[in-house]
Amino acid sequence: MKKGLFVFFVAVLLVSFSQTFAQKSGTGNWFAYFGNQAINKKWNWWNEVQYRNYNFIGDRQQLLLRTGIGYNLTENNNNLSLGYAFINSQNYLPGTEDKIGFDEHRIYQQFLTRQNFGRVFLQHRYRIEERFLPDDFKMRFRYFLSLNVPINNKTLSANTIYASIYNEIFLNS
């Protein structure tokens, strides 16, 4: 088991290392805060702030503010949510130093479900977004999958160090 885990981590490291050299953009960063506050056993309040920069710091690319209310269908496993997001984007025009800014408003609905198989914890998120852009309206469907494996514990409890792999698929209409 330990040999298999070691091989897995080495493979992830090698794939990540090769992908690092494939990037063509400069240094940037992405600060994020995620909060989930229980209102009672059935209801929760979700909030999120993401601040993204070009050129390491001070050159804003995007500010995302998202909040929502969730209802637990089952304890710690299945949650339905409804929410709103405000996004301010500052994108560079291709081949120039000029930026164009715009605001986007999103209403979203999502279903979150969690599963565990021994020490492997999976999370699936299905989200539908109604996107209100300047002079346009679009729909987007998203599927997010994360896999977490605790390293120093058998469960994902407080102060647990864990490995995480995740990805998300976006389908724009």
Task: Enumerate the predicted regions with their spans.
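Residues on the lipid-exposed face of transmembrane beta-strands in outer-membrane beta-barrel proteins
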Residues: Y33-Q37, T67-Y71, Q109-Q115, I128, ...
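Residues that define the transmembrane beta-barrel architecture of outer-membrane proteins
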Residues: T27-N29, Q61-L63, D103-I107, F137-Y143
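Transmembrane beta-strands of outer-membrane beta-barrel pores
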Residues: V49-N55, Y84-Q90, Q115-F117, I128-F132, ...
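Start-of-domain marker
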Residues: Q23-Q90
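Membrane-embedded beta-strand positions of outer-membrane beta-barrel proteins
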Residues: N47, L80-L82, F111, H124-Y126, ...
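Short loop/turn motifs that connect adjacent beta-strands in outer-membrane beta-barrel proteins
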Residues: S25, K41-K42, T74-N77, N116-F121, ...
